[in-house]
Amino acid sequence: MTDHKPSKSLPKATAKRLPQYYRLFKSLVEENVTRTNSQLISEKIGVDAATIRRDFSLFGELGRRGYGYETKVLRDFFGELLGQDQETHIALIGVGNLGRALLHYQFQDRNKMRITQAYDISGNPLVGTQTDDGIPIYNISDLEKNVKKSDIKTAILSVRKENAQEVVDTLVKAGIKVSLNFAPIRLKVPSDVVVQSIDLTKELQTLLFFMNDNKQ
C-alpha cells in the first residue's frame, strides 16, 4: 500500500468520515473479517460506495481492484491518521451540566483520549476539587498558566456563548491548536487553529424539521 498522509486541503466532509472508517475496520478485525469492499463498507456505515472510493483515493492505493481492502491494514492506517497510537490529553472548560457529563464520559474505553484538567469560574463549588477519577477542577484564571506547563494539546469548550471567544483566545495563547466548541457561536481564531463547533440546539432543530417533513 502506498504510504500517504492527508494534506491540509483534505475536504472537511472526508475528514469527518475518518472516525467512521476507523471504527468500522476496527470492528471488522475484531470479527475476524480479513477483507472487504466499498459496497460492503457502504452498507455498514450508510455512505455511498462512490464517496468511499473517492475518499480512499485521496490517500493513495488503499486497496486493489478486484481484491478489495484488507481490514487490518486499513484499521492501522486510519488509526494512525487519528492518532490512536498515542494518548491525547484534553482540557475541559466549563463544568456545568454538559461539562459534568463529559467529565464522566469514558473516552479512554473507546480510544486514547482523556480529560486530564477541567476549569470553571470561582463561583462554581466544584472549583478546587477533583472528580472521583482524580481529574482536578481549576479556576479559569489558571487556564493559560496550567496548560502551558502541561502536555495538553486540545480542549473542549462547554461555556456560555458570551464567554466562549475569551476562552478560545486564552487557549490559543496557551498553544492549543485544536478545540471542540459546544457554545452556539462562531469563534474567530487564527488560520492555523481548528475549532469544531457543535450546536446541539441547531442539530435538534434539524431533526425536528426532518420529523415534520416526513409527516407530510
UniProtKB/Swiss-Prot annotation:
Coiled coil: none
Record-annotated DNA-binding residue ranges: 20-59
Keywords: Cytoplasm, DNA-binding, NAD, Repressor, Transcription, Transcription regulation
GO cellular component: cytoplasm
GO BP, sorted A to Z: negative regulation of DNA-templated transcription; response to redox state
Any Pfam family matching the protein: CoA_binding
SUPFAM superfamilies hit by this protein: NAD(P)-binding Rossmann-fold domains, Winged helix' DNA-binding domain
Domain of life assignment: Bacteria
Cellular compartment(s): Cytoplasm
Molecular function GO labels: DNA binding; DNA-binding transcription factor activity
Residues binding NAD(+), per UniProt: G94, V95, G96, N97, L98, G99
Function: Modulates transcription in response to changes in cellular NADH/NAD(+) redox state.
Listed NCBIfam families: PRK05472.1-3, PRK05472.1-5, PRK05472.2-3, PRK05472.2-4, PRK05472.2-5
Subunit text: Homodimer.
UniProt family annotation: Belongs to the transcriptional regulatory Rex family.
Protein's name according to its UniProt entry: Redox-sensing transcriptional repressor Rex
UniProt source species: Lactococcus lactis subsp. lactis (strain IL1403)
